[in-house]
């Protein structure tokens, strides 16, 4: 399997450099145009060249027909080992819900159980862990809570090894939040912590609050596994925690997606999040739960939980899992692809898009590690053997499966960003439009063919209100920021999306 050396960015340039043509008086499309191009039926997942270097797939193409192609991209459950896949499929038929939520929740639970016992070495000195930050996005009744309950049933029912079980906490962020988490992580029996949120909007509001910066930095450190110092006097453990690990999982309704974005700008939170979005629920009659499959899921987690037995210290160092030569070749080509996309100066990447691309290789490593250990655990469960603590390697097939998952999450992230941006654009535009209408302002921009500097012309007594709205617009990064640098026009002299959006409706 050899990657093609195509270097095609034209479609992505179009998406990021052209302006929106939706006017204030027009109804928005039923679903925002999303950055995917091919239905799954037309995508050969087995050919790494198609998936790996097709930039239309990774970076998006505006679908002029208005159809939402992402509705045709389900979670690739074929990447799971056979019995685990059967558990996900039959459980979702029983629940009459899309498999997306349960599949994503299972990935997070596996990563939490593995915790800090194993790490994948992508390059010399570059280790990634199996923990994930994931958010299930859907309307009320779409099945977020049932999926969480099914994936976490072995934990809720205390069916894992009690001596080496990990913590599931519902604690909301407070002044002592960091202290509580790190104190739990420092305990000898703790492999990792799963921070579970049935509804994540409150959590995101707190960490994105200007007073919550410390909490957000703490979560970023716990995601990356960087050493953390505990110095507060009321904490039982004081000192340096070498490899703290935390996973994050919960649900968020579509109308609350705006809480994901910090008003001060993109800081990497969205790039660290993986989003599960439901597709069409399974058709046909519901079926009874299969106790054998449910027990298989328990055995899988027990097998993975036993990996913590061979770490054996209060602050265990992870055992490293290496890639074989085929996996290394694929990994290096994926790295080159994402580097080429990020470094192409002709592409006007927004800060959030840049964050997603920057974290793509890291997320690929995490998904690869999870699938590798999950497949190994299922083999051991079916053969009745103990999981091998040593000698596990990543093969080329597994990293390709992880790439399929990465693409699924990648597209979902762009979907979420598009919904946030579209809603924000619409809200700011209406506010500015109503302000100008109330104050008799007919022209607020001056331009020469959309190519010169855009600037507000103060024709009202309260110009500060207009300026404040512009500050809000720029803080959202709606086509005005590129790699953290403000610019008033995108490449080719075209106006930013928001500028044209209101310009066409205020003259």
Question: What does each of the following model-derived ranges do?
Answer:
Residues 4-6, 21, 44-50:
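Intrinsic-disorder-associated, low-complexity terminal segments enriched in Asp/Asn/His/Tyr and depleted
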Residues 27, 34-507:
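Phosphate-handling catalytic cores of nucleic-acid transaction enzymes
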């Amino acid at each position: 399997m050899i990657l093609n050396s195509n270097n095609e960015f034209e479609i992505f340039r179009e998406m990021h450099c052209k302006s929106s043509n939706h006017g204030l008086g027009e109804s928005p499309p039923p679903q925002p145009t999303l950055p995917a191009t091919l239905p799954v039926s037309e995508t050969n997942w087995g050919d790494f060249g198609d998936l790996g270097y097709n930039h239309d797939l990774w970076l998006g193409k505006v679908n002029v027909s208005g159809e939402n192609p992402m509705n045709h991209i389900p979670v690739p459950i074929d990447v799971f080992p056979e019995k685990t896949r059967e558990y996900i499929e039959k459980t979702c038929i029983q629940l009459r819900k899309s498999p997306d939520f349960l599949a994503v929740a299972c990935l997070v639970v596996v990563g939490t159980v593995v915790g800090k016992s194993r790490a994948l070495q992508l390059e010399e000195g570059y280790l990634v862990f199996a923990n994930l930050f994931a958010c299930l996005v859907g309307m009320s009744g779409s099945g977020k809570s049932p999926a969480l309950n099914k994936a976490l049933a072995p934990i809720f029912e205390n069916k894992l090894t009690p001596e080496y079980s990990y913590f599931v906490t519902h604690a909301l962020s407070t002044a002592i939040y960091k202290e509580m988490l790190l104190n739990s992580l420092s305990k000898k029996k703790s492999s990792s912590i799963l921070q579970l949120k049935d509804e994540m909007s409150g959590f995101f509001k707190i960490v994105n609050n200007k007073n919550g910066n410390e909490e957000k930095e703490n979560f970023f450190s716990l995601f990356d596994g960087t050493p953390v110092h505990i110095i507060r006097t009321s904490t039982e453990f004081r000192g340096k925690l070498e490899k703290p690990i935390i996973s994050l999982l919960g649900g968020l309704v579509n109308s609350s997606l705006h809480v994901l974005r910090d008003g001060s700008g993109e800081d990497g939170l969205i790039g660290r999040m993986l989003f599960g979005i439901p597709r069409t629920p399974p058709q046909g009659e519901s079926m009874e739960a299969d106790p054998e499959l449910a027990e298989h899921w328990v055995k899988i987690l027990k097998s993975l939980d036993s990996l913590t037995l061979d770490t054996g210290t209060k602050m265990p160092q992870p055992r490293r899992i290496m890639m074989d030569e085929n996996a290394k070749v694929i990994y290096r080509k994926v790295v080159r692809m994402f580097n080429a996309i990020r470094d192409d100066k002709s592409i006007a990447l927004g800060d959030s898009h840049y964050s997603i691309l920057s974290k793509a290789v890291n997320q690929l490593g995490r998904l690869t590690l999870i699938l590798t250990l999950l497949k190994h655990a299922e083999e051991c469960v079916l053969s009745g053997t103990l999981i091998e603590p040593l000698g596990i390697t990543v093969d080329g097939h597994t990293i390709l499966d992880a790439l399929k998952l990465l693409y699924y999450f990648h597209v979902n992230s762009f979907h979420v960003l598009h919904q946030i941006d579209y809603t924000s654009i619409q809200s700011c535009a209406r506010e500015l439009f109503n302000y100008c209408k109330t104050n008799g302002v007919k022209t607020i921009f001056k331009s020469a063919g959309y190519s010169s500097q855009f600037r507000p012309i103060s024709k009202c007594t309260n110009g500060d209100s207009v300026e404040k709205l512009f500050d809000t617009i720029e803080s959202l990064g709606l086509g005005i920021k590129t790699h953290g640098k403000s610019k008033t026009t995108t490449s080719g002299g075209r106006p930013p999306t928001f500028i044209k959006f209101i310009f066409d409706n205020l003259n």
